[in-house]
């Protein structure tokens, strides 16, 4: 920040410069440059012929916008009160006296008789092109729409309301500039350069136009923010100002569609001649015809009557509360994506009751910037918002909050008492649905990409010389045949002899029982044995297997699995043993306890530090049939969540609705057994 004395000095310099520089440079005759070749000059309709380098400077555009604004100086709207044209005029540029003198030396007037004939022809052609653009009927039609909408929203639509929220301005621009692209496709870029001044977008490059020209736009906005309110105003002014345009409106409930239909009729009848309207209530259609012009139409429908919009032709289709639209109605709506001159605008709040139905959130990964989200928490502080119960708005206070929205801790607490998480969803919009997957993410995307892409060729002789002689296998058995529930996870890890902290994943299995029979222990042991055999064939340097069979679910079944595996394993195998406190007997099972958190932390650190890799020839007889085993594991790693406990500890979980974390737990524990030297492995003693 500037110190106060520097700020005062700069303000004094600015005041002195503005007082001394009075050159306005308003020319009645065109100006031509001296000694400028044709390839290095350009004709400008407001100035004359100048050097082409001016096209890369904002000074020329600022000067023209100031003295030749595209916005009308005396607007005559059909409704409402026009806004002052000075509101959208940039600051007047000031020229130093030395710069002004130099420019006058380089430029001459047309009446100085030094301009060449070809420069005059170039200027006249540029001027004619500019005048023809302003004389275009499409330009006047679109200009009338902006003037009418601006005046209508200037305290006429709702008394006392003169300004729009940022998302409402975005909605107007997405609607308007798409109309420009279909009404005047050859002159879209020229009209964009003119009409962007109406929105105060003086420094916006023409490349942004591609965003407005896209076939679909999505707006996720919290409730009670004026979504339907601005849609009614836009549709009303479109019908009254633009000819030959077809608009569609689809709502999630019949009473909403009827309310919008009635409000648009009320608005048009109040501010425009009622004789221009042709209302057909039986099919929810409004036809507006201006004297001497072609008619424009609006059809209001609901998702329950999806066949009513089939066969229609819409240039603009507004889908209100799209997250609550019936899924079987979506094909009829999305069919308009195939129409060349049609745009779909989805407007919705986030579905609090079932976040999985917020299908619009999938568009955040689209190649086009289709998703527009109104949120009161920025991405940088989303974690702070979730971790602090008393926090109700973004700590940086950079985001705009309307005056008619009340956000405080008491409202947050009361809302969440009705339904947990409802306030967060409504407040954060897209953030609440996506933050659950990213809030507690503990493994970075770069680390996962490296783990997935950089796999080690463990069959190479140079690599096998560095592999350890012992293979660590962890079995997390599940005794169920329900493929939607848990399955048996098996992980196999080997360490490096050169770097003990570095380890490699050689095999993984996610096994589900076919039937619940007495052979469950044998099937699980056979699955692990098949994996060990394949690993032994690919890596002949491995001499012994250190195994751990989890016995938390069933100690008897765990002992049975270890016993069978001990008999059929092709390599010498040792097991972790659990000592029975009552009988002092040792069983070949492992009772998983509080060390699970330590194992996850070790695994997470290994992934983030790059000390854990996967083999190019990962053995998997249960996953590889339909999925890449490493990618399958990565999907479970992405779901790892670290949840703080009340006692100050931490708990890790990766359970998902569509996928269990059995394989991940097995790999995590196998890695933990391989890198931790506190565990003792012993063979099963014959009785």
Swiss-Prot record:
Single GO cellular component term: host cell nucleus
Region (Disordered): 67-91
Pfam families linked to this entry: DNA_pack_C, DNA_pack_N
Entry's Gene Ontology BP terms: chromosome organization
UniProt short sequence motif Walker A motif, positions renumbered to this chain: 221-228
Location(s) in or outside the cell: Host nucleus
Motif segment (Walker B motif): 316-321
Keywords tagged on the record: DNA-binding, Host nucleus, Hydrolase, Viral genome packaging, Viral release from host cell
Statement: the UniProt record of this protein carries the keyword Magnesium: no
Residues annotated as catalytic: 321 (for atpase activity), 476 (for nuclease activity), 550 (for nuclease activity), 662 (for nuclease activity)
Superkingdom of this protein's organism: Viruses
GO molecular function, one term: DNA binding
UniProt entry tagged with the keyword Zinc: no
Enzyme Commission designation: 3.1.-.-
Disulfide bonds: none
Recorded family membership: Belongs to the herpesviridae TRM3 protein family.
HAMAP family: HSV_TRM3 (MF_04013)
Quaternary structure note: Interacts with the terminase subunits TRM1 and TRM2. Interacts with portal protein.
Function: Component of the molecular motor that translocates viral genomic DNA in empty capsid during DNA packaging. Forms a tripartite terminase complex together with TRM1 and TRM2 in the host cytoplasm. Once the complex reaches the host nucleus, it interacts with the capsid portal vertex. This portal forms a ring in which genomic DNA is translocated into the capsid. TRM3 carries an RNase H-like nuclease activity that plays an important role for the cleavage of concatemeric viral DNA into unit length genomes.
Protein name per UniProt: Tripartite terminase subunit 3
Organism, scientific name: Human herpesvirus 8 type P (isolate GK18) (HHV-8)
Origin organism lineage: Viruses, Duplodnaviria, Heunggongvirae, Peploviricota, Herviviricetes
């Amino acid at each position: 920040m500037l110190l106060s004395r520097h700020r005062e000095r700069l303000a004094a310099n600015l005041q002195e410069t503005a007082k001394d520089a009075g050159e306005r440079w308003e020319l009645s005759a065109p100006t031509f440059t001296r000694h400028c070749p044709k390839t290095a000059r350009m004709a400008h309709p407001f100035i004359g012929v100048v050097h082409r380098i001016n096209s890369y400077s904002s000074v020329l555009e600022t000067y023209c916008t100031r003295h030749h604004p595209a916005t009308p100086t005396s607007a005559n709207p059909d409704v409402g009160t026009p806004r002052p044209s000075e509101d959208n005029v940039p600051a007047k540029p000031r020229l130093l006296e030395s710069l002004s003198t130099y420019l006058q030396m380089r430029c001459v007037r047309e009446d100085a008789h030094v301009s060449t004939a070809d420069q005059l022809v170039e200027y006249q052609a540029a001027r004619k092109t500019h005048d023809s653009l302003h004389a275009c009927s499409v330009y006047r039609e679109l200009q009338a729409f902006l003037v009418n909408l601006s005046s209508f929203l200037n305290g006429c639509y709702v008394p006392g309301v003169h300004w729009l929220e940022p998302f409402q301005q975005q909605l107007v621009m997405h609607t308007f500039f798409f109309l420009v692209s279909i009404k005047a496709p050859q002159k879209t870029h020229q009209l964009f350069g003119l009409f962007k001044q109406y929105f105060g977008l003086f420094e916006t490059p023409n490349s942004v136009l591609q965003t407005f020209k896209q076939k679909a736009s999505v707006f996720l906005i919290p409730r009670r923010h004026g979504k339907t309110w601005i849609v009614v105003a836009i549709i009303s002014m479109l019908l009254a100002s633009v000819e030959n345009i077809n608009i569609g409106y689809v709502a999630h409930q019949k009473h909403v569609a009827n309310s919008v239909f009635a409000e648009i009729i009320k608005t048009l009848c109040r501010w425009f001649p009622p004789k221009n309207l042709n209302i057909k209530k039986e099919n929810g259609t409004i036809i507006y015809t201006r004297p001497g012009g072609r008619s424009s139409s609006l059809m209001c429908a609901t998702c329950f009557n999806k066949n009513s919009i089939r066969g229609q032709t819409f240039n603009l289709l507004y889908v209100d509360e799209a997250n609550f639209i019936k899924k079987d109605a979506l094909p009829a709506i999305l069919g308009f994506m195939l129409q060349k001159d049609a745009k779909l605008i989805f407007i919705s709040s986030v579905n609090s009751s079932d976040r999985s139905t917020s299908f619009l959130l999938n568009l955040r990964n689209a190649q086009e910037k289709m998703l527009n989200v109104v949120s009161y928490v920025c991405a940088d502080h989303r974690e702070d918002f979730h971790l602090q119960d008393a926090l109700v708005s973004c700590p940086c206070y950079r985001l705009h909050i309307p005056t008619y929205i009340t956000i405080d801790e008491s409202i947050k607490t009361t809302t969440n008492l009705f339904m947990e998480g409802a306030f967060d969803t409504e407040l954060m919009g897209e953030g609440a649905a996506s933050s659950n997957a990213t809030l507690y993410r503990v493994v970075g995307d770069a680390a996962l990409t490296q783990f997935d892409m950089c796999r080690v060729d463990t069959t190479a002789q140079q690599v096998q010389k560095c592999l350890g002689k012992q293979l660590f296998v962890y079995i997390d058995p599940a005794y169920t045949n329900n493929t939607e529930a848990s399955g048996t996870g098996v992980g196999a890890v080997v360490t490096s002899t050169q770097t003990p902290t570095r380890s490699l994943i050689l095999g993984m299995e996610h096994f589900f029982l076919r039937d619940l029979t007495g052979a469950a222990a044998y099937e699980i042991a056979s699955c692990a044995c098949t994996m060990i055999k394949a690993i032994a064939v690919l890596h002949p340097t491995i001499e012994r297997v250190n195994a751990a069979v989890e016995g938390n679910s069933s100690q008897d079944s765990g002992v049975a699995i270890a016993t069978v595996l001990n008999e059929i394993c092709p390599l010498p195998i040792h097991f972790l043993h659990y000592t029975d406190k009552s009988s002092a007997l040792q069983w070949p099972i492992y009772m998983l306890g509080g060390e699970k958190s330590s194992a996850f932390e070790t695994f997470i650190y290994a992934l983030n530090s790059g000390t854990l890799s996967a083999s190019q020839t990962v053995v998997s007889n249960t996953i590889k049939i339909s999925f890449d085993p490493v990618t399958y594991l990565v999907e479970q790693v992405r779901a790892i969540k670290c949840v703080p406990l009340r006692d100050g500890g931490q708990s890790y979980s990766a359970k998902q609705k569509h996928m269990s974390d059995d394989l991940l737990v097995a790999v995590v524990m196998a890695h933990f057994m391989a890198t931790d030297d506190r565990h003792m492995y012993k063979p099963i003693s014959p009785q």
